[in-house]
């Protein structure tokens, strides 16, 4: 059996651009792509913390160090500049692979620069 597990996420990125007439995708600062292991053209899920929208698209590169997180094409209709989003990618793996797998969790500041990374999420308490 194969399981779909969270491979990586960029937590609480700020949308810097929204380009309706650009070819569809999400442009992400290349430093963030490198830190997460998200590949260009890989499917990503976008969860808008600000408005609750959830959708998928694919990643393309933005200039390294720029802090750019730009939603393009139809995806631009789901967000506004300034929205806080989570960008996630999943991977399919066997149960044995899942037993030792650790996701790459990348946390960013208000300028979409890496503040810290982790491979676990704290247990949520009641």
Swiss-Prot record:
Protein's UniProt keywords contain Lyase: yes
Reaction(s) the record says it catalyses: L-aspartate + H(+) = beta-alanine + CO2
Gene Ontology cellular component annotations, sorted alphabetically: cytosol
Pathway: Cofactor biosynthesis; (R)-pantothenate biosynthesis; beta-alanine from L-aspartate: step 1/1
Requisite cofactors: pyruvate
Any one of the GO BP annotations: pantothenate biosynthetic process
InterPro entries reported in the protein's UniProt record: Asp_de-COase-like_dom_sf, Asp_decarbox
Broad class of the protein's primary localization: cytoplasm
GO MF assignments: aspartate 1-decarboxylase activity
E.C. designation(s): 4.1.1.11
Binding residues for substrate: 57, 73-75
Pfam family membership, one: Asp_decarbox
Quaternary structure annotation from Swiss-Prot or TrEMBL: Heterooctamer of four alpha and four beta subunits.
Name of the protein described by the UniProt record: Aspartate 1-decarboxylase
Species name: Stenotrophomonas maltophilia (strain R551-3)
Gene behind this protein: panD
């Amino acid at each position: 059996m194969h399981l779909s597990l969270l491979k990586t996420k960029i937590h609480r990125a700020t949308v810097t651009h929204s380009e309706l007439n650009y070819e569809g995708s999400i442009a992400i600062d290349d430093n963030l792509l490198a830190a997460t292991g998200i590949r260009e053209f890989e499917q990503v899920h976008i969860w808008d913390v600000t408005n609750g929208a959830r959708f998928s698209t694919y990643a393309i590169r933005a200039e390294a160090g720029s802090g750019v997180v730009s939603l393009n094409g139809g995806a631009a209709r789901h967000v506004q500049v300034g929205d806080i989003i989570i960008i996630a990618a999943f991977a399919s793996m066997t149960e044995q692979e899942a037993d030792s797998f650790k996701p790459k969790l990348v946390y960013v500041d208000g300028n979409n620069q890496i503040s810290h990374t982790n491979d676990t999420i704290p247990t949520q308490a009641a």
